[in-house]
């Protein structure tokens, strides 16, 4: 029996850009050996960030008229990872896999009024061992 797997990670400003490099596949040499560069073209965005994550955060602050000093260790963003086991994805196929991640995205948009406006990026990776989605949001 398969289960939905969700992991949430709190991130400081210093940690955010490293996540962006990984999620957007900006590095030429990946430290994660599970990434298969021949499959990277299969990755897709449900919501694409226009800028780096820190610049998106700064744009978010300005757009929402949020002011004040943030400490260097302040949590500015969270990353949620949605996945399941490989058997689950093999059984449901490509079309239902896409629907699975679309439904995960919709769930978070509606969860406790988080709203799509707080989501910076949502990217599905199909070039690693098991399909998964990285969803970055401002808490």
Region annotations inferred by a language model:
Residues 1-139:
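N-terminal nicking endonuclease/strand-transfer module with a His-rich metal-binding environment
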